[in-house]
């Protein structure tokens, strides 16, 4: 049994046995998250508050979109009847990304079966699957001339495979019409969906992304329908099934977590062989969502990035406005270059050792 397997089994037992209740989940995390350098258990965050909107600092503010390319992208997406997480999740980077003809398409409908406290996507009974969506998505990719496309989705707990087959069909259609386009998918956790990881791995995306979103001690409040261990396990399984696929995960800060907890998540993700980590500021979409506990400064983000780089990630992106698919095309090129560089360094080390 690997270190990760032992770590996952502890979370699996506690979360399932406890029904993910706050007291036991917190107790479990306190045991697992003792600071390795001091032996001390970090102070756990206060209860997350709802019902109040806090003022955003200057470093969070962005310009309103007004370019012609922005509106061209908006019209194309509308005409092809596609959903985007850019709109549904009220992403602050929508103006910049759409002006560059970059959009993260959201498949499987616009209604989610989960009710995460950070997310602005609608929750409720989802619509029937649209069998023509993969073809429309492929058409949009071709018309936009995308070199790199990011596909995400709502959670579909109502589907037998959680929507994994639909993801695979989207990848297949894009490969047919845009064979040179690289494909990044940002999936749900496929909780209790046996075989979903295998379907995704066999579809061979260039990048597999699944966000852990926050630290384990906040799951019960912020991400109540999910399990931290399941997210780690999914990332690890994809890497085992398709080692050539880059894996990626992201999290938000500013929800009340301690830095030591964030560092522990970094360690867990590296144990799961994750290549690329993104860290961004949580922004409260409406007063009905979790309140921002803290606006993390740009300097603190730089610190987190430095720490993450020491853990061995191929790529780290950490800033107030960092989101999973922000600058995804540029980051993918850097990711490949970093991989080649590390591979060459390892090869040289082996050659030196042999000689």
Swiss-Prot record:
One of its GO terms (molecular function) is 4 iron, 4 sulfur cluster binding. It is found in: Cytoplasm. [4Fe-4S] cluster 1 binds at residues 86, 91, 97, 325. Belongs to the radical SAM superfamily. Lipoyl synthase family. Its EC number is 2.8.1.8. Keywords: 4Fe-4S, Cytoplasm, Iron, Iron-sulfur, Metal-binding, S-adenosyl-L-methionine, Transferase. This is Lipoyl synthase.
